[in-house]
Amino acid sequence: MEVCGGHTHAIYRHGLPELLPPMIELVHGPGCPVCVLPMGRIDDGLALAEQPNVIFAAFGDMMRVPGRKGTPLEYQARGADVRMVYSPLDALKLAQANPQKHVVFFAIGFETTAPSTALTLMRAKQLGIRNFSVFCNHVLIVPAIRAILDSPDMRLDGFIGPGHVSTVIGCRPYLFVARDYGKPLVVSGFEPLDLLQAILMILRQLREGRAEVENQYRRVVPWNGNPAALKAMAEVFELRPYFEWRGLGFISQSAFKIAPAYADWDAEVRFDIPGIRVTDPKAAQCGEVLKGVLKPPQCKLFGRECTPEHPIGALMVSNEGACAAYYHYVHRLSATRSA
């Protein structure tokens, strides 16, 4: 299983499955933060966008993710002040430029993006900017991997470990995969040769009867991670007791919340969040794809009702979603060839 959504796109973009022998199957994991966010959290965030005098700021890949009553872009069309930003600091600058408004930043991502949110909150506190808050949806990769390993559907032989997340947390947090579950894990880069080498390293471990954590991406990923980023996250965030993941259910200590020292900048403290629970559309099978039980084209809606132009599930919306990757690099190419 390649855990990271960026790896999924690289695998399909470069046609790597066609280069591998049939006995090697690549299974797509839950490493897309937009895809694993349940619809209820999206609705909670969009409820903030409907508040008077609120500017709702979000990354571009969130703008087309549907809640029950529409996407952020559709809320914008109905009159809500929804802005796309490229970083949390952009949202903070919005707050400085609009002192009469309250800016809520919809924070999302794994440990890759959490440090930038943490540093932005530290900056807001330092400058005393009070018309800014964060709706925190940062999730953690290690509890998700553990949930997959504990799943009764688990039929995996090894893991391609995430590249970007590991630049922050390092390789050490994955040791439990080999120690407790006897599965090899190799942290990989994103070039075709990186991924092929990572697959080769996993196969060598399996052939030799080993289960270890190895680092193919040593040119970028330090074994112990990024100390400055880890320190910032430790200051600003603490673990939630549990958090709901699309397809995986509730996972304990799998997401960050904003620490009490930064409560003045916590949207969940500043506003009355409804705490909506929503089930996914019945026909969509995002959960099974996220767990690696199904391939994207095995979903009944894939390529028919659910396309990038009209996405039903989050896996088709996000740039890192497995369904979007398969559609762009495999399904569309196959349709062109058959025509």
List each model region and its residues.
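Secondary-structure transition/capping motifs at alpha-helix termini
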Residues: 127-130, 209
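A conserved active-site cap/scaffold subdomain adjacent to cofactor or substrate pockets
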Residues: 135, 153-222
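Internal helical hairpin/lid segments
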Residues: 196-288
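Generic beta-sheet signal
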Residues: 59, 85, 106, 135-137, ...
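Metallocofactor- and cofactor-centric catalytic cores in central/energy metabolism, strongly enriched
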Residues: 1-100, 114, 118, 122-127, ...
